[in-house]
């Protein structure tokens, strides 16, 4: 039976459960009920201030609550449970636990709450504290030096609240001490009752807060002095008791102590106390002494009132309430002493002020009368910078002071002469009360001279008194003793002495711990809090403060090859000496100095500011890379204030880095980018480090913010201050660094480099060593490196001209203190001017630069409204100075001398341009862009002076200007007037526009004096010093030469190699360090395997099982270790080849740097292991493959300094594992890049690996494949099993692919890749296709069924032939295009087109080619000239002499390449085709072109200029979505192995994590072919309704990676048509990223479709006109026919359709009219006479040779007249067809039929049996013959018509036979013509033709049958047929009689089952018209040429009206036609059928 029960405390959502004894459960429950009542109602969200925030706080509050109750057992049990649960059984301290709660995001809380709920209640309940050795005290016994300090007055106004909090939290620990002290104070203070007007009962004030005096009373020194001491004693007591130590035991851990001002008393107290008794005794002495000190000081220097105005003024200026002590910060002692001297000079001695506390180098306190200190403040205000004043552009020495001065809340002038009298009184009190401190066991240091009190001969207490009252505090002296951890016991917390001391001690290795404050550590962890004292942990870890000198000072290291380096953070980062050359224009623009510096072993920056385009910079970088040692990297410097350059510079760097260029760093000068921009640089550019050059304290802060945002990325902070050469700030070099050094060093990733003013080892060594700062009274502040600029300008490799170099040597320079004089005058040969960017810039004070300075001071500083006036006034002076002294002379110059531009002739302008921009001496232009500018000006001259149009330009190419003098002379001979004509105003503007044109080199002259003068004067002003030949008179004094005023001191030689300059400095540093650090013994320098790169890290990965033996085994289960820790673990701590290989960030490939693949390959994987042989260091990695742990990576040293990395793949074609070997050279001489890949045969090794992978190890590897020949694949029989496995792998569930009996089993289109894989993939193996297969990307894939070919199916025997269509070098890599053709029984079935891309950069153009089937082009010839141009082309061969207006060209080309833009050869051949009017296409010519080196293809150029492409797809304006997309969501497979197996594509990037990692892929990417197949299956389903055969083509581009289990969403849209097939656009996106992964296009055949053309009867006015207006194609059909009608028959068919006139007159005037009349006369038709004989008659009997006009008349409109109806309807249908055909809507294999008249439209449209003109002739003739075939009255009306009949409307039983019966009997009975002529829809729609009377009779007979419900069918069953006829005749007779009685001709009306066809007055298709058949047949024969009838267009497609069956070319079909027609021609064919076979 359990003896415990769970007991739960809850508050809102917070709960805590503990097990309590059964016998106490009731008591617990009672206490809980009472406790809950004390809690407020729970709040939602964050807990309120009075609520517990966590289970621990809830439990703590409960423990505090029950500690007041009478249940000691419960308290004890609960406390034990609390300690067990939260304090790890007291292995953790309550303070540490409380601080941890502050970082708990689950239960947010505050420091106040954890103090109240945790700390207070814990100590309320705890009865005893065991002795615990904290981590800190443990280290005190070993390596830590712990000291204690105590503060003084003035830290805070509310110091008493600190004591109150202590009493609240730790009452039980300090109660006894406080009682004793309170008693002592109560004994003493009555003696000073006039002072202690409100008493001194501190215990009462603590217990009863309402009795606490006001703040003024508490701040009075008699009260504050003893109470502050009480606070410190309490803190000390709490510390000892929490640790379980006596004061003596804790003191033994302290090395020394001291106190600030009165804090000395407490320091002496703890030093003299070795037990609680002695501590109490000494504590009472201390508070007694301080009571006397406070009282006597006040009585000696009483507090007096101040004038209200003084008080208010002081408060208004933020200086606080005047008191006897004033804090002054951020001024040096010298500066403050100067102000004191000024102030005291106006005061009597007793009012003097003095420095009383020197807290730090720039932290002082003054003591004196408040009025005097107020006067000091007034004096300081005059020179103090107001808040917000921007002084960044003011020289540092001239700036107003930035400082803080504020009165302290201390009301006695401590540490000054003003308290001398108080000293004596205090000492009397001491003697009177017998106070003393004896037996100090640890040093306590004097605050005046830093001496040890233990050595004092006078009484310690006497010295203490004097140190508090009179002697100034030198706090740095007092604390200048060894310490690693300093405990500040208050008061004041973060406002107290600890933080002040931290500022002094920062960087010295002393960590400040605020022993009196509990809080979480600050963000930067600058100092610690109370909990650090008590922290306990198994690892005994404590925090240490940085020691700048120890950690950052330079040391030496020697690599395995004996080379010595100065080791700093900078040199460790670079693996080079810690010296660099800064990017500076123009010096480091040139590649010589950059290459030389790098090869000498020193980092240097290419000055990007000297380049104006990406091409220029790339060319320079290529040059550098080709000249430097492999592994070396360069830096690039860009100017932040030049946004134009950044716009192209940053993308260029990114692009080059991605290509592997060894660009190591980017430095941004002249501004610090924002964090966002810097982040882009850091994350996107692939740099080793980012250099930033801040120019001010604020800018340094920006750099720090950037570094903090990227704590693991190196930021090189280059500090140059204002003394640097070239552009510079206004800053002092030292002061900003002193101010910001500690903040900089808190960012471990910042590398600090000093620059400017340096030139030797001697002047730079103090900065590397850090001792430079000591002269400013700061601890050593080492820099990590030094940069040089001016110093290298005279180097041999510098392009600085010799004269400029000599001028630099002549400059003497100045020391640091004098450089600011350059702002006003030449100093050391240097002066500051304002650059084009408005920034200060140092230049040598040449004549030209002094003129620049003059203009800066007199012209360029003027506002715009005064500028022009000043320029005009000084015009002559400025022009003279330009011509005599400056590098850019005045442009204007004519025969008379100096002039303005507008006073020059065109020729003079041209000559002047040549004079100033062309360097005659060396026969070159200053820059090619200036040559081109000159060319543009000459072309303007040509435009002005060329008199005739069509004149060929003299300047065809700018290269003609390479020697401009002769060309210019010849040029102006052609245009003599240009030598006389002054340049026009318009051309002046054009000239100035050219001169200022962006993108070209700025002009070397000044053309104008206006607001643009400064631009022309200053722009591009630095290059001249490097190219004196281009300067007038080669006068160096005209030029601008950048140089630093301080650095100038060190340049004494000309043409010293840069390597020698830098080596001498580096070797000087080495010699100095050997002497100082290694006692002159070089052998003591530590030796390492290599130097540079990452330091080895000692780590312990907790989730890794390590087995140690002959080989170390590292095993990973399901929990993964941190990647970096894992790599560090594998690398080990020993520097060797394996450590270098694993840890290096870069691998050298040739001249390129690529990221280390091991970082990805060795990424920790679940259930894997790694073994490392201890002896050989061979590493083998194993991973789980199908349940087995198999080796996947091996790394070993195969021979000295040669490493082999093998990647092993087990999933192969023959299942045998294959290894891919990579070879590397280990170069320990270069620690920055110690691993160089051996590139020889690398690609071949990779190809051989893939060959074995895809084809099997038994197939011999061969790269001897001819790229110009077809690659043959194996013959394969398609089986149902392979189809099934494939469809299963891709998830295609289409029924067509399922093997079932009785049907063919189709193979998916994608199956072609399985068939053709080996042939297609062999195309990437030829030796000439050289590329890295691991960088191969499948770009696209496409399938296309051959026209007419059936899909692949089971049982097909197929083979593949692959052809390489293209091998192209592109910017993104090498493109290989392969077309594989699948053959079945020797016939092509399908084409598979795949494009692959070898990512990278390739230049082997000799191996590249492209075979192109050019897009067919039609060329229209509008003139004889056009024809002549074509005939003149050598490549055009006309083979038939025919007339043509339009030709079609179908060509194929083969291109071979010489370079990216030049072909080595071109061959183009093809057919030239002509379409005849009959639509027949014949070849009339050919194209045959072949050429060698070419820049273009003249054939395609001609066709693209003159023609238009055809056979292109037609894209809809608005796409039609096929699905919403949601239902097309799919998931990528979790593994790619099934597809790899069925497809044969074993590329390991799809199945192997290791290979995918090597290829820099985010995972094993899904096969592109799988994605293609699975998405195509969706197309099959959604766009082809699961009819597989309808998908005729599918192509897709793989635009994004798909990873296992990715969720994909596909959308489909019907976007257009091509040749009658739907174009379906497919897009598949990754659902999570929303990025596209596949974009495809499918061609879907439409379902079997028959096109039907309507007949007569459907016409209406305006028909087809909407389409006519919107479709160009339709309009062309109408217009062509209309022209034919107008020209041949004199009327417009368009007019008839649009307006439907009732009559139309044709006039026969003129020759054209007569020809039209002849056409009418010639129209004949044949009829059968009464005698039965055939006779011919004119259709238009009224027209003869004398007729002048003819009028067509129709009462219902001419459109209803048959002769017009028929051509109009035919044209409407033809136009509609041609329109949809033009839109690609017509499939190639369709059936068609025409209803009646529509048969003509059908045949002419789909079978092209006649041109449009013949078509309209035929139907017009047909209409006319029919129109005249029936008699008509005078109104043109006939007695014939047609009706539509629906028998089903008569009755349900009235069917086809019934209708036929009734029609026949009506005809028989009436003898009128009545026939069914159209059988449209059985039982529903028929058309009857005949006599109107007969039609009317039929209508009404059917009405009678319906009304009377007479069932003819039933009657036929019930009686004989004769009887039925008899009854029917009765009805017919009655109805016919009524029809005869109606007005004739009858106007037919609608019946129940009959609808009249209005407008038809001819009995079409009836026997009545039989006589017209033969003549019409003869007419048709004339109009339909035999050549236009193509059987293939008719067989199986054309459904004639006659047969209602698809046309066949068979004897049976012809027989059926004969049976229907009795045609003699058909009979003749049948009789002679054998002849036709």
Swiss-Prot record:
Q: What CDD domains would the database entry show?
A: FAS_MaoC
What EC designation does it have? 2.3.1.86, 4.2.1.59, 1.3.1.9, 2.3.1.38
- A Pfam family matched in the record: FAS_N
- Which residue ranges does the record annotate as region Acetyltransferase? 1-453
SMART domains in the record: PKS_AT (SM00827)
Q: Which UniProt keywords apply?
A: Fatty acid biosynthesis, Fatty acid metabolism, Hydrolase, Lipid biosynthesis, Lipid metabolism, Lyase, Multifunctional enzyme, NAD, NADP, Oxidoreductase, Transferase
> Does RNA-binding show up as a keyword for this record?
no
Domain named MaoC-like is located at: 1506-1634
Q: Name one GO molecular function term.
A: enoyl-[acyl-carrier-protein] reductase (NADPH) activity
Where is the region Malonyl/palmitoyl transferase?
Answer: 1613-1833
Cite the record's note on assembly. Answer: [Alpha(6)beta(6)] hexamers of two multifunctional subunits (alpha and beta).
**What is this protein's function per UniProt?**
Fatty acid synthetase catalyzes the formation of long-chain fatty acids from acetyl-CoA, malonyl-CoA and NADPH. The beta subunit contains domains for: [acyl-carrier-protein] acetyltransferase and malonyltransferase, S-acyl fatty acid synthase thioesterase, enoyl-[acyl-carrier-protein] reductase, and 3-hydroxypalmitoyl-[acyl-carrier-protein] dehydratase.
State the name under which the record lists this protein.
Answer: Fatty acid synthase subunit beta
């Amino acid at each position: 039976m359990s003896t415990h029960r769970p007991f739960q405390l809850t508050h809102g959502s917070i709960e805590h459960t503990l097990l309590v004894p059964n016998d106490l459960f009731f008591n617990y429950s009672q206490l809980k009920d009472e406790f809950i009542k004390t809690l407020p109602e729970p709040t939602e969200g964050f807990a309120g201030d009075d609520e517990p925030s966590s289970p621990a706080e809830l439990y703590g509050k409960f423990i505090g609550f029950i500690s007041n109750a009478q249940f000691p057992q419960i308290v004890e049990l609960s406390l034990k449970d609390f300690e067990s649960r939260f304090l790890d059984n007291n292995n953790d301290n309550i303070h540490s636990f409380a601080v941890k709660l502050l970082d708990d995001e689950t239960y947010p809380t505050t420091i106040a709450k954890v103090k109240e709920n945790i700390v207070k209640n814990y100590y309320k309940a705890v009865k005893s504290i065991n002795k615990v050795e904290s981590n800190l005290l443990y280290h005190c016994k070993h390596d830590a030096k712990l000291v204690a300090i105590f503060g003084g007055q003035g830290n805070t106004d509310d110091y008493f609240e600190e004591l109150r909090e202590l009493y609240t939290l730790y009452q039980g620990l300090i109660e006894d001490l406080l009682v004793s002290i309170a008693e002592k104070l109560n004994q003493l203070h009555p003696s000073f009752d006039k002072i202690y007007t409100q008493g001194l009962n501190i215990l009462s004030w603590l217990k009863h807060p309402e009795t606490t005096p006001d703040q003024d009373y508490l701040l009075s020194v008699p009260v504050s002095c003893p109470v502050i001491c009480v606070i410190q004693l309490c803190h000390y007591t709490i510390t000892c008791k929490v640790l379980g130590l006596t004061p003596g035991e804790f003191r033994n851990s302290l090395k020394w102590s001291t106190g600030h001002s009165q804090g000395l008393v407490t320091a002496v107290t703890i030093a003299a106390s070795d037990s609680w008794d002695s501590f109490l005794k000494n504590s009472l002495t201390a508070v007694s002494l301080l009571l006397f000190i406070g009282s006597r000081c006040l009585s000696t220097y009483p507090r007096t009132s101040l004038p209200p105005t003084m008080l208010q003024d002081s408060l208004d200026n933020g200086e606080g309430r005047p008191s006897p002590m004033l804090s002054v910060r951020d001024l040096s002692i010298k500066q403050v002493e100067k102000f004191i001297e000024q102030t005291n000079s106006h005061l009597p001695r007793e009012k003097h002020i003095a420095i009383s506390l020197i807290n730090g180098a720039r932290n002082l306190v003054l003591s004196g009368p408040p009025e005097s200190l107020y006067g000091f403040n007034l004096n300081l205000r005059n020179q103090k910078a107001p808040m917000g004043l921007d002084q960044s552009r003011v020289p540092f020495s001239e700036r107003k002071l930035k400082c803080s001065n504020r009165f302290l809340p201390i009301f006695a002038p401590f540490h000054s002469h003003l308290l001398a009298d108080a000293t004596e009184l205090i000492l009397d009190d001491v003697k009177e009360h017998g106070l003393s401190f004896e037996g100090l066991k640890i040093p306590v240091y004097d605050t005046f001279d830093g001496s040890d009190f233990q050595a004092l001969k006078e009484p310690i207490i006497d010295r203490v008194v004097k140190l508090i009252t009179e002697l100034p505090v030198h706090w740095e002296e007092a604390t200048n003793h060894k310490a690693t951890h300093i405990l500040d016991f208050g008061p004041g917390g973060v406002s107290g002495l600890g933080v002040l001391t931290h500022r002094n001690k920062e960087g010295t290795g002393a960590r400040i711990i605020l022993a009196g404050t509990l809080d979480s550590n600050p963000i930067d962890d600058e100092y610690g809090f109370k909990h650090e004292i008590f922290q306990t942990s198994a690892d005994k870890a404590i925090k240490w403060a940085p020691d700048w000198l120890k950690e950052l000072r330079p040391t030496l290291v020697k690599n395995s090859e004996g080379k010595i380096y100065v080791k700093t953070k900078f040199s460790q980062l670079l693996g080079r000496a810690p010296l660099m050359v800064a990017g500076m224009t123009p010096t480091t623009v040139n590649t010589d100095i950059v290459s030389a510096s790098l090869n000498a072993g020193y980092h240097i920056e290419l000055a990007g500011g000297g380049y104006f385009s990406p091409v220029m910079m790339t060319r320079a970088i290529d040059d550098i890379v080709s000249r430097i040692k492999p592994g070396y990297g360069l830096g690039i410097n860009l100017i932040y204030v030049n946004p134009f350059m950044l716009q192209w510079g940053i993308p260029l760097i990114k692009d080059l880095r991605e290509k592997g260029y060894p660009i190591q760093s980017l430095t941004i000068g002249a501004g610090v980018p924002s964090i966002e921009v810097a982040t882009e640089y850091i994350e996107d550019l692939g740099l080793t480090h980012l250099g930033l050059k801040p120019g001010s304290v604020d800018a340094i802060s920006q750099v720090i913010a950037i570094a903090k945002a990227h704590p693991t990325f190196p930021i090189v902070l280059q500090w140059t201050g204002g003394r640097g050469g070239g552009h510079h700030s206004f800053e002092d070099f030292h002061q900003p660094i002193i101010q910001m050094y500690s903040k900089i060093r808190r960012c471990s990733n910042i590398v600090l480099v000093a620059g400017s003013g340096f030139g030797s080892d001697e002047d730079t060594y103090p900065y590397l060593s850090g001792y430079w700062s000591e002269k400013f009274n700061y601890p050593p502040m080492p820099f990590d490196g030094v940069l040089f600029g001016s110093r290298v300008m005279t180097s041999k490799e510098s392009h600085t001209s010799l004269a400029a170099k000599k001028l630099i040597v002549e400059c003497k320079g100045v020391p640091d203190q004098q450089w600011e004089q350059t702002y006003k005058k030449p100093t050391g040969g240097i002066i500051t001017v304002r650059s084009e960017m408005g920034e200060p810039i140092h230049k040598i004070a040449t004549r030209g630069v002094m003129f620049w300075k003059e203009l800066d001071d007199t012209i360029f500083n003027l506002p715009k409204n005064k500028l022009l006036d000043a320029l005009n006034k000084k015009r002559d002076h400025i022009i003279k100075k330009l011509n005599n002294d400056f590098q850019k002379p005045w442009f204007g110059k004519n025969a008379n001398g100096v002039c303005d531009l507008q006073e020059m002739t065109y020729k003079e302008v041209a000559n002047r341009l040549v004079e100033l921009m062309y360097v005659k001496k060396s026969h070159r232009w200053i820059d090619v862009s200036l040559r081109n500018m000159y060319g543009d000006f000459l072309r303007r001259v040509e435009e002005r002076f060329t008199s005739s149009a069509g004149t060929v330009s003299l300047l065809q190419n700018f290269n003609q200007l390479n020697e401009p003098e002769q060309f210019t002379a010849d040029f102006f001979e052609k245009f003599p007037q240009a030598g006389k004509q002054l340049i026009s105003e318009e051309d002046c503007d054009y000239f100035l526009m050219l001169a200022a044109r962006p993108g070209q080199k700025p002009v070397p002259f000044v053309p104008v004096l206006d607001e643009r003068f400064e631009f022309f004067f200053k722009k591009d002003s630095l290059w001249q010093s490097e190219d004196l030949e281009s300067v007038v008179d080669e006068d160096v004094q005209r030029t601008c030469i950048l140089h630093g005023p301080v650095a100038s001191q060190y340049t004494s030689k000309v043409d010293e190699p840069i390597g020698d300059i830098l080596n001498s400095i580096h070797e000087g540093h080495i010699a100095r360090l050997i002497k100082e650090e290694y006692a002159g013994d070089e052998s003591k320098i530590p030796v390492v395997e290599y130097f540079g790169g990452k330091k080895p890290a000692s780590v312990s990965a907790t989730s890794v099982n390590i087995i140690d033996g002959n080989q170390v085994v590292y095993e990973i289960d399901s929990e993964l270790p941190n990647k970096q820790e894992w790599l560090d673990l594998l690398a080990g701590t020993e520097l060797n080849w394996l450590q270098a290989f694993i840890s290096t960030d870069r691998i050298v490939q040739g001249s390129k740097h690529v990221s280390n693949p091991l970082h990805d390959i060795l990424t920790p994987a679940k259930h894997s292991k790694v073994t490392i042989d201890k002896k050989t260091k061979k590493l083998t990695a194993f991973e789980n493959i199908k349940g087995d742990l198999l080796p996947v990576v091996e790394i070993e040293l195969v021979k000295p300094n040669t490493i082999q990395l093998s990647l092993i793949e087990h999933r192969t074609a023959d299942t045998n594992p294959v290894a891919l070997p990579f070879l590397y050279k280990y170069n320990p001489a270069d620690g920055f890049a110690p691993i160089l890949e051996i590139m020889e045969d690398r690609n071949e090794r990779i190809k051989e690996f893939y060959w074995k992978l895809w084809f099997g190890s038994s197939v011999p590897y061969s790269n001897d494949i001819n790229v110009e020949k077809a690659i043959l694949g194996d013959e394969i029989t398609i089986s149902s099993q392979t189809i099934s496995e494939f469809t299963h792998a891709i998830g295609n569930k289409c029924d067509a692919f399922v093997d079932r009996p009785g049907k063919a089993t189709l193979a998916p289109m994608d199956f072609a890749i399985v068939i053709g894989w080996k042939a297609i993939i062999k195309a990437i193996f030829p030796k000439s296709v050289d590329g890295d297969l691991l960088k191969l990307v499948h770009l696209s894939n496409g399938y296309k069924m051959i026209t007419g070919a059936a899909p692949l199916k089971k049982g097909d025997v197929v083979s593949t032939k692959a052809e390489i269509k293209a091998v192209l070098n592109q910017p993104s890599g090498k493109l290989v295009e392969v077309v594989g053709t699948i053959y079945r029984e020797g016939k092509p079935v399908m084409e598979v087109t795949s494009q692959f891309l070898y990512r990278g950069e390739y230049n082997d153009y000799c191996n590249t080619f492209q075979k192109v089937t050019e897009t067919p082009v039609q060329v229209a010839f509008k003139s004889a000239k056009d024809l002549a141009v074509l005939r003149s082309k050598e490549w055009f061969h006309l083979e038939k002499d025919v007339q043509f207006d339009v030709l079609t060209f179908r060509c194929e080309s083969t291109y071979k390449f010489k370079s990216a833009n030049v072909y080595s050869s071109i061959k183009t051949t093809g057919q030239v085709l002509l379409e005849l009017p009959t639509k027949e296409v014949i070849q009339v010519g050919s194209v045959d072109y072949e050429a060698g080196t070419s820049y273009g293809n003249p054939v395609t150029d001609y066709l693209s200029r003159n023609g238009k492409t055809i056979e292109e797809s037609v894209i809809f304006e608005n796409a039609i979505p096929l699905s919403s997309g949601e239902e097309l969501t799919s998931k990528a497979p979790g593994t790619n192995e099934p597809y790899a197996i069925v497809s044969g594509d074993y590329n390991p990037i799809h199945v192997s994590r290791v290979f995918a990692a090597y290829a820099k892929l985010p995972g094993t990417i899904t096969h592109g072919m799988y994605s293609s197949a699975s998405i195509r299956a969706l197309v099959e389903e959604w766009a082809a309704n699961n009819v597989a055969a309808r998908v005729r083509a599918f192509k897709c581009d793989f635009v994004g990676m798909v990873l296992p289990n990715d969720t994909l969403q596909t959308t489909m849209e019907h976007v257009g048509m091509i040749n009658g097939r739907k174009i379906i656009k497919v897009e598949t996106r990754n659902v999570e990223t929303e990025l596209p992964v596949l974009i495809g296009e499918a061609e879907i055949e439409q379902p079997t479709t028959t096109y039907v053309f309507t007949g007569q009867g459907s016409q209406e006015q305006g028909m087809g006109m909407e389409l006519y207006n919107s479709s160009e194609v339709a309009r062309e059909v109408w217009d062509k026919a209309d022209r034919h009608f107008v020209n041949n028959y004199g009327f417009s068919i368009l007019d008839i359709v649009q307006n439907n006139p009732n009559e139309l007159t044709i006039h026969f005037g003129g020759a054209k009219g007569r020809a039209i009349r002849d056409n009418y006369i010639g129209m004949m038709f044949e009829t059968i006479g009464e005698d039965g004989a055939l006779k011919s008659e004119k259709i238009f009997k009224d027209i003869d040779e004398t007729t002048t006009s003819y009028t067509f008349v129709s009462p219902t409109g001419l459109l209803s007249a048959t002769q017009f109806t028929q051509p109009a309807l035919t044209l409407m249908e033809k136009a509609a067809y041609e329109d949809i055909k033009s839109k690609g809507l017509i499939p190639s294999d369709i059936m068609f039929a025409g209803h009646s008249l529509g048969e003509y439209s059908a045949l002419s449209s789909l079978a092209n049996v006649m041109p449009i003109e013949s078509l309209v002739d035929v139907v017009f003739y047909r209409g006319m013959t029919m129109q005249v075939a029936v008699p008509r009255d005078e109104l043109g009306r006939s007695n014939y018509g047609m009706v539509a009949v629906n028998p089903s409307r008569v009755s349900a039983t009235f069917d086809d036979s019934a209708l036929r019966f009734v029609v026949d009997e009506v005809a028989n009975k009436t003898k009128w013509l009545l026939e069914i002529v159209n059988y449209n829809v059985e039982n529903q729609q028929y058309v009857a033709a005949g006599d109107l009377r007969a039609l009317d009779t039929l209508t009404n007979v059917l009405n009678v049958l319906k009304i009377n419900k007479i069932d003819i069918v039933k009657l036929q069953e019930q009686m004989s047929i004769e009887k039925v006829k008899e009854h029917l005749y009765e009805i017919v007779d009655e109805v016919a009689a009524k029809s005869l009685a109606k007005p004739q001709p009858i106007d037919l009306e609608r019946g129940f089952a009959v609808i009249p066809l209005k407008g038809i007055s001819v009995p079409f298709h009836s026997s009545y018209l039989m006589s017209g058949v033969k003549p019409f047949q003869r007419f048709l024969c004339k109009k339909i040429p035999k050549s236009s009838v193509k059987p293939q267009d008719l067989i199986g497609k054309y459904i004639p009206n006659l047969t209602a069956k698809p046309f066949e070319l068979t004897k049976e079909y012809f027989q059926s036609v004969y049976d229907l027609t009795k045609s003699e021609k058909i009979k003749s064919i049948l009789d002679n059928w054998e002849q036709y076979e």
